[in-house]
Amino acid sequence: MAATPPSSQHRRPLSSSASAASLAGKPRGGGLLLGRYELGRLLGHGTFAKVYQARSADSGEPVAIKVLDKEKAMRHGLVPHIKREIAILRRVRHPNIVRLFEVMATKSKIYFVMELVRGGELFGRVAKGRLKEDTARRYFQQLVSAVGFCHARGVFHRDLKPENLLVDEHGDLKVSDFGLSAVADQFHPDGLLHTFCGTPSYVAPEVLARRGYDGAKADIWSCGIILFVLMAGYLPFHDQNLMAMYRKIYRGEFRCPRWFSKDLSSLLNRILDTNPETRITVKEVMESRWFQKGFRPVRFYVEDDQVHSLADGDNDMPELEPSEPPPPPPFPPPPPQQDDDGEESGWESDSSVASCPATLSSEERRQRPLGSLTRPASLNAFDIISFSKGFDLSGLFEERGSEVRFISAEPMQTIITKLEEIAKVKSFFVRRKDWRVSIEGTREGLKGPLTIGAEIFELTPSLVVVEVKKKAGDKEEYDDFCNRELKPGMQHLVHHMGSVPNIPSDTE
């Protein structure tokens, strides 16, 4: 269910006996939903969910809230799908993908607090007639950029169609409704997906054939159908008889209208290739002449779990106050326990209210002291030692997947300055906020620019821990940066200790 009104054939008004309050858990008498959101009008609904416009009571920011009935979801076996959608939306943070802010639950309802996209569905725009080529191209560029970003993170949408593409007030496209999405770990031993899903008019022939299919190739087929619809105003494969339409899809029987340019027709013929082995890839689409015209790769960074788009030339780094810098935050605790879906466990607890924030709220960001984070105020020696492999705090570089940590006795400003110098060697952009540094690469790719976060935590009054982790981008590029630039450049700042430092206890 998209966070905007669905197309007219799916929308119906609430009956007189059912109000928004009773359906969504909105308190009677104008109260707040779970004490946090003012629920507004119903935007639309499907079989299992309703979407309401709402407003944050703390910040006043408008949001969309998707409400699901927990009992109905469990009865129809949708709980794994819901959990997977939550995990996927947190994995694919991109300017052209609808954002998930928070997930809340009561004993009877599940609430998705999402970005409110005011412009409506792309379907509504094309229903009025075909689009101009430059307009269609811009939407297609944003669609393919978002889809390629998802694929690079092992996510395959599987239900791409104009009804699931929204347009915001700035005219930018947003991909929504990941309810049928698959992740790479769902592949069968043959490396393919086997579940039939999607809308027949937009589904690739190998999916209709109910044989194993490549999720990325199936998604790019759907993108081609969408492009054809935007440019022609009708579907390339259409027939009143469903089986006749299937035959046309299997055979690839379609014709481009005479107003399609040669480059566009060539691109569509390569996308709508019935053989997935020879079908064009996302990378090849993005390199095509028709796609490249006027294309500006999206540039963005993620900070505090918020997606921030960058305008051209917006590379300035916010300066730290030159006077007394804020104290560094305490050393971070271990990440929360996660279940097999990569989602924090406990969301379907029997407690009356459970909340699983995807980001800090605007109010929390305003109230948070400069330089502090939402972490415990203090940790004892055992907590800190447990972070280091084998209880070893010798100061050597420690690697944990996409994270690198080391201990230093150097002044924090010296460490930050060195990080900036290393980044500039690679012509990376640098952003500073308190004792955090964000290093952003310039090389574009399906995964977006490489983004590295570095943060300094106080271990003792004389020692700090520096934590570096990949926040976005290609892992190989990150590993190369760490091995060739970061580790050699920071090695002289690493503090080598003969024993574990004297860490104050909680009672001191």
UniProtKB/Swiss-Prot annotation:
Pfam families assigned to the protein according to its UniProt record, in alphabetical order: NAF, Pkinase
InterPro entries xrefs: Kinase-like_dom_sf, NAF/FISL_domain, NAF_dom, Prot_kinase_dom, Protein_kinase_ATP_BS, Ser/Thr_kinase_AS
Region of interest: Disordered: 1-24, 311-372
Domain remark in the UniProt entry: The activation loop within the kinase domain is the target of phosphorylation/activation by upstream protein kinases. The PPI motif mediates the interaction with the ABI (abscisic acid-insensitive) phosphatases.
Tissue specificity remark: Expressed in roots, leaf blades and sheaths and panicles.
Taxonomic lineage from the root: Eukaryota, Viridiplantae, Streptophyta, Embryophyta, Tracheophyta
Species assigned in the record: Oryza sativa subsp. japonica
Needed co-factor(s): Mn(2+)
Protein name per the record: CBL-interacting protein kinase 19
Ranges that cross the membrane: none
Positions contributing to ATP binding: L43, G44, H45, G46, T47, F48, A49, K50, V51, K66
Alphabetical list of PANTHER family matching this protein: CALCIUM/CALMODULIN-DEPENDENT PROTEIN KINASE KINASE-RELATED (PTHR43895), CBL-INTERACTING PROTEIN KINASE 19 (PTHR43895:SF6)
Limits of the Protein kinase domain: 37-291
Family membership: Belongs to the protein kinase superfamily. CAMK Ser/Thr protein kinase family. SNF1 subfamily.
Acidic residues bias spans: 313-322, 338-347
Enzyme class: transferase
Residue ranges annotated for the NAF domain, each copy included: 354-398
Biological process according to GO: signal transduction
GO MF terms held by the record: ATP binding; protein serine kinase activity; protein serine/threonine kinase activity
Induction data: By light, nutrient deprivation and N(6)-benzylaminopurine (BA).
The protein's Enzyme Commission number: 2.7.11.1
